[in-house]
Amino acid sequence: MSPHLIYVVGPSGAGKDSLLNWLRAKLPAASPLRWARRTINRPATAEGEDHESVSNEAFSFLLETQQLAMHWSANTHQYGIRYSELLPLPQPSWVFVNGSRAYMNEAVASHPGMKVLHITAERHVLQQRLLGRGRESLENIEQRLNRTPHLNIPAGCHFMEFLNHDPLEVSGPKLLKALTALPGWPAA
């Protein structure tokens, strides 16, 4: 049985990674939910995402040998999801894919039935969060926010939008409640 795929996208500052980490920490380890590990051509860091770090050459080899079910470029890096990350478990399963808005339509086309979860926030909230990180100047943040792509949602796509304006201890349970409304979502 194929897993249910949830392709998660959102702009920088929306809290996508924080919410995914919250879900990972709160859901039982024995649940049929898992997170596809990304393959990225950047070094792994202790405080960063647990991804498979590969060189540019290794990433090119994975593409040439068709070992990636999904792949895209963003922020000077190459991202991919190996086919093995999308394999079903013995029981019905759900797989979260931390994806890209720019690649969303291609992902939906190549994985029929995939659900898209768009985690976002109003512009002023995104700006405040990005400023709080202290990684970019206000000018760079404004440029980032101005180039946010418009989402063209494919026909027939199960699309969910989650506005994340609240603190994590409020937004995490709200997101989980929204996910439990999906048909076939595992009982707690």
Feature roles, as predicted:
Residues 95-99, 110-132:
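Conserved phosphate-donor/acceptor-positioning beta-strand/loop module used by diverse small-molecule
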Residues 14:
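ATP-binding Walker
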Residues 8:
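Hydrophobic anchor at the beta1->P-loop junction of P-loop NTPases
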Residues 17:
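Walker A/P-loop
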Residues 38-95:
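ATP-dependent small-molecule kinase phosphotransfer cores
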Residues 132-182, 186-188:
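Small-molecule kinase domains that catalyze NTP-dependent phosphoryl transfer to phosphate-bearing small molecules
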Residues 11:
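P-loop (Walker A) phosphate-binding loop of NTP-binding proteins
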